[in-house]
Structure formats: structure tokens, C-alpha cells
């Protein structure tokens, strides 16, 4: 008692002197049901997953399909295996799960127009990448599958046609497509296409849970892989002038990178040389950084660049990716998410294509019991600093019965960027939408309700998606930029935009794929803090052109056309 009396004044004094917890003005609310996003994404077994094809899940996309200035939504779907069998379930007519396309009604709600839009394929979908491959002003889609991938051409008004065979992209055999990105790697103004293949999987020959050394997790029998399963090679297709594609995987050097289990693929200029590179998160193996050699070929430089492994030199189970400038130096940094018992990687750009993993020193190492998936670095509170958001969900539904600390359904994890160097875990203060447990996979970020803050669309396994509306309560300004290429591809994919506000810089890239197997709205969102305008906007186009705009007023969407800024260098 005497000891308590002696300690109490000191404890009270320390508490009084401790800095007050800064208010966090971001609150996520899941409005999916009332917004009309109600169809579940069927993906493998519910209580147990026998094979790895049931576990990885799929992505989602925020994109303006009909050009009306409002973001539409696509949520990919999977299927199930027949009970006790090694084949996909044959569904009754009309019941087969398909990917769902929702048109934005411009009032906070969406309408399911899947059938009218032309989506009817059933199967284990993986990822989606978006780009205007024919430069007609309407955004097209490429969707990867366990089986055969599909190129959807936008016919206008958000109606799509399967043109895979017509475009020369019909595969000669089934493969397990994973990440993809449209990318103009040769600077001819036409989008080419990168496609990753996760691994070579033969359902007929696959081992049952627990049958091999790679079929146990912490002693519990689980589905096997990816370790121990044969790898595959990645693909690069070059677009010809007639709108068809040719396979240049071998000639470009892309197929020479082997022994990986590639997942999400993001295409951006990561070394600042004006040519688009491709970064690929890889499961249980070293990540890949395809450096563009400016001559139609690529070289994997992930190891010398510092983005192959974690800060201790270990391979990680790379799932999702986020690209943004978290430290405000005008260079693109990388966020990569991983498996349970690990933490995300945060690769800080040192310039000239060199990076260092600062995840631990930045404060991202405080959580490690979740499997991390869709990720991004959106500026959630519009203060001009890139925050961190990622979804979670275990791949083994049965593990929770043995280890409660590894939940099958997890929360969304939110870190606030404090000062460009350190992050604070604000998940518990980010509203019911962030805390609600789901086994989530892909996340797409965008301002679907056009209210000036970043919302999130989340693919949930065997549940409807979550539509997390950001009920931002602060007064910070913002600016959204939409690019329109002329010499470059029409959508501006691969461009880097650097916005300068009150002495601080923010860099973002226009990406075909990011997060986990997903696509963010192409309008780049920048927080302005207490400022009313951006002092300068610099656009580095994939053609090599650089446009500069001065004194751009905020709280609006601005379209920037290549070469029309009035200031070009």
C-alpha cells in the first residue's frame, strides 16, 4: 500500500506529461447492403479448403466504365469443387456464380447490371487489370483465371465483349493466371500486357491435406502449397498496330525469371528513368522487379535494388502491393503484404532504383498474426501524407479451432502516417467497417461517392463484398487528377504525378493493377491539408513528356491532357 502511495503521484505526473493522442478523423462504415452490393463471392469450401485453388481468392475494381465521372464497381467471383471430388462443381442453370458488375447510380447506390454488361463466365477468377488498350476512350478489362484468361473490350456505355481470341490472347492450354498489368513498355502509345502465372497445378494429381511436408501448418493438416508445387513462367504480350497481341515472353526476358510463385503485378517507373518497370509480389519466394532496359527487354533487378526480400534478407509470402510516396520526397515507395507470423515490407525509395525496407522502424511491425492481402497507401485523412490500409483473412478455415490467435476472419488494418517516417496503428479508431471480421482478399480504393475522400471496395470470401465509405470528419482540402494521354496511352497508365503543396511533395502513379489482384480508380487522389491549392503538379508521362501546372485550385477533379498544360519540359 505504501509502495502504491509512493508510485501514484509519479504515474499521474507521467500521464499528465504524456502527449495527447491525436484525433483520427477517419471512420469507415460498411454500406454495401444499402448501396446494392449484395451478391456473394463464392470461393471454395466454407469450413475447409482441400486444395490451394480454393484459398487465394480474387480481386475487385473501382473504375468508370461508362465515362460519366462516377466510379463503377466490379467484384470477381470464384466457384466450388464437388464434394469429395476433384472437379469444379456443375451448378444448376442460373445459379452459377459469376463476377458482378455494379453501375454507380450517382446517389450513393449501385445497380447490378452484370448480365447486361456481358459478364457470364464461371470459374476461379483471380485478378483484374484495367486499361484502354484500343485507345478509344472506354476502359477495357483483363481478368485472369485458373484455366483461361479473358480480355473484355468496352463497347461503350459499360457494355463488354469477350475479344480474347480475336485479340490473339487465347491460351493454348489451361494455366493459373495470377497478377496482370496493361503496360506500354516500348513507348509506342499502345498498351501491351503482362500476365503472371502463379504455379502449375494439376487438380487430378494434387495431394490431400496433411499428405506431404508442405501440407501442414503448425502441425495441423491443411491444403498443400505453394512450396513443393511446380512453378510456371510469366508472359508478356506486345500489342501490334492492328490491336492484336504477340507473345514476346522469351524475347523480352520476362519468361527467363523462374522459380517464383508470382501474385500481384504493378507497372510503374520505379527508377525514375522515364520507362515503365514491373514489380511482382511473389508468394514464399523472392519478389521480381523487371527493370525496363529501353530496348524491348527486361532484367530482374529485385535483389540489387533491395526489394526481393525483407530487411533481414528472407523471402516472404508476397501477396498485395501498394505504391505511393509515404515520406514526401517525390519518389515512389512500395508496400508489400505477407502471411501470418510476418509483417508488411515498406520499401523506401533511395532514388535511382534503390530501396530499403523500413517497415520495423516505421512502426508497421506491431501486428503479425493476420494473413495480409489487399493493400494500399491512400491519404485517408487528406493531410498530404500516404497512410497504410490492408485487408486480412486466413487461408486455412480449420486453423482457428487449434490456434485462436490466427482468426480465419480478420479486420482491416489501418496505420496513420504521423510525420512521413512513423506510422501509428489506428485500426481500433477507424470505425465499424474496419473492425468487422471477414476473410478478405482484394481491395480497390477510390472516391465512389465523389465527396473528396478515399473509400474502399473489399472482396470477401463466400460473402458479399464490403463497401467501406470513408466518413471523413476533418476539413482538409483535396485534389483528384485524371490523366488523358495523347502521345501516351489514352488512360495515362505508367505515368507518375508529383504534387507540391506548401513545400511538401507527394508522388503517385497511374496503375493498371495494385492492392491484391485489384484496380484502383484511375483518378489520383491527393490530400492538400489546410491548403486551398497545389502549388505545382508535375506529370511524367510514359512517352517521356513532362507537363507542369502551377497553382491548381483544390476540392475538385482536374483532367490533365498530355501536352496541354501550357508548361512542358
Give the location of each predicted region.
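Repeat-based blade/solenoid architectures
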Residues: 37-59, 95, 117-129, 169-181, ...
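Asp-box/WD-like beta-propeller blade repeats and closely related beta-sheet repeat scaffolds
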Residues: 113-133, 138, 144-185, 195-227, ...
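Hydrophobic beta-strand segments that make up the repeating blades of beta-propeller
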Residues: 70-77, 136-145, 193-197, 273, ...
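Short, conserved, GDST-rich strand-edge loop motifs in beta-rich repeat architectures
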Residues: 76-94, 197-229, 390-407
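Beta-propeller blade termini
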Residues: 56-67, 103, 124-139, 153, ...
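Gly/Ser/Thr/Pro-enriched helix-cap/hinge segments flanking short amphipathic alpha-helices
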Residues: 19-27, 35, 45, 362, ...
Amino acid at each position: 500500500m505504501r509502495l502504491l502511495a509512493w508510485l501514484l503521484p509519479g504515474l499521474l505526473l507521467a500521464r499528465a506529461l504524456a502527449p495527447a493522442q491525436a484525433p483520427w478523423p477517419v471512420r469507415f462504415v460498411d454500406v454495401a447492403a444499402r448501396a446494392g452490393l449484395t451478391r456473394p463471392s463464392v470461393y471454395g469450401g466454407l469450413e475447409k479448403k482441400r486444395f490451394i485453388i480454393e484459398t487465394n481468392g480474387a480481386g475487385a475494381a473501382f473504375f468508370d466504365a461508362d465515362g460519366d465521372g462516377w466510379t463503377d464497381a466490379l467484384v470477381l467471383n470464384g466457384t466450388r469443387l464437388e464434394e469429395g471430388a476433384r472437379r469444379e462443381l456443375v451448378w444448376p442453370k442460373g445459379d452459377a456464380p459469376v463476377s458482378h458488375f455494379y453501375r454507380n447510380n450517382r446517389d450513393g447506390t449501385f445497380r447490378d447490371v452484370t448480365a447486361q454488361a456481358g459478364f457470364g463466365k464461371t470459374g476461379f477468377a483471380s485478378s483484374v487489370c484495367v486499361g484502354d488498350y484500343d485507345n478509344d476512350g472506354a476502359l477495357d478489362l483483363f481478368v485472369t483465371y485458373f484455366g483461361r484468361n479473358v480480355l473484355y473490350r468496352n463497347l461503350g456505355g459499360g457494355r463488354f465483349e469477350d475479344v480474347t481470341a480475336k485479340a490473339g490472347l487465347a491460351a493454348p492450354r489451361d494455366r493459373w493466371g495470377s497478377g496482370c498489368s496493361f503496360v506500354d513498355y516500348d513507348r509506342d502509345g499502345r498498351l501491351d500486357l503482362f500476365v503472371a502465372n502463379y504455379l502449375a497445378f494439376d487438380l487430378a494429381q494434387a495431394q490431400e491435406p496433411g499428405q506431404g511436408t508442405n501440407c501442414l501448418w503448425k502441425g495441423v493438416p491443411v491444403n498443400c502449397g505453394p512450396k513443393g508445387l511446380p512453378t510456371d513462367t510469366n508472359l508478356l504480350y506486345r500489342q501490334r498496330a492492328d490491336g492484336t497481341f504477340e507473345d514476346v515472353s522469351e524475347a523480352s526476358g520476362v519468361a527467363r525469371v523462374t522459380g517464383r510463385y508470382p501474385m500481384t503485378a504493378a507497372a510503374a517507373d520505379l527508377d525514375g528513368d522515364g520507362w515503365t518497370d514491373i514489380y511482382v509480389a511473389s508468394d514464399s519466394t523472392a519478389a521480381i522487379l523487371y527493370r525496363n532496359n529501353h530496348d524491348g527487354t527486361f532484367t530482374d533487378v529485385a535483389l540489387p535494388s533491395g526489394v526481393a526480400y525483407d530487411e533481414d534478407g528472407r523471402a516472404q509470402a508476397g501477396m498485395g502491393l501498394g505504391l505511393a510516396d509515404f515520406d514526401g520526397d517525390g519518389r515512389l515507395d512500395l508496400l508489400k503484404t505477407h502471411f501470418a507470423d510476418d509483417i508488411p515490407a515498406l520499401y523506401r525509395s533511395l532514388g535511382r532504383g534503390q530501396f530499403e525496407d523500413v517497415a520495423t522502424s516505421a512502426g508497421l511491425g506491431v501486428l503479425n498474426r493476420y494473413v495480409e492481402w489487399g493493400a494500399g497507401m491512400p491519404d485517408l485523412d487528406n493531410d498530404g501524407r500516404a497512410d497504410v490500409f490492408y485487408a486480412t483473412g486466413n487461408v486455412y478455415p480449420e486453423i482457428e479451432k487449434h490456434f485462436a490467435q490466427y482468426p480465419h476472419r480478420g479486420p482491416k488494418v489501418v496505420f496513420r502516417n504521423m510525420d512521413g517516417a512513423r506510422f501509428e496503428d489506428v485500426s481500433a479508431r477507424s470505425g465499424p467497417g474496419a473492425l468487422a471480421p471477414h476473410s478478405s482478399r482484394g481491395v480497390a480504393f477510390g472516391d465512389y461517392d465523389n465527396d473528396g475522400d478515399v473509400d474502399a471496395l473489399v472482396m470477401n470470401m463466400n460473402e458479399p463484398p464490403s463497401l467501406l465509405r470513408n466518413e471523413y470528419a476533418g476539413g482538409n482540402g483535396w485534389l483528384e487528377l485524371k490523366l488523358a494521354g495523347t502521345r501516351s496511352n489514352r488512360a495515362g497508365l505508367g505515368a507518375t504525378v508529383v504534387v507540391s503543396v506548401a513545400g511538401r511533395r507527394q508522388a503517385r502513379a497511374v496503375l493498371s493493377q495494385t492492392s491484391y489482384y485489384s484496380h484502383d480508380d484511375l483518378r489520383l487522389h491527393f490530400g492538400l491539408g489546410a491548403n486551398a491549392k497545389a502549388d505545382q503538379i508535375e506529370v511524367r508521362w510514359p512517352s517521356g513528356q513532362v507537363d507542369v501546372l502551377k497553382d491548381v485550385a483544390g476540392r475538385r477533379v482536374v483532367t490533365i491532357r498530355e501536352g496541354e498544360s501550357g508548361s512542358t519540359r
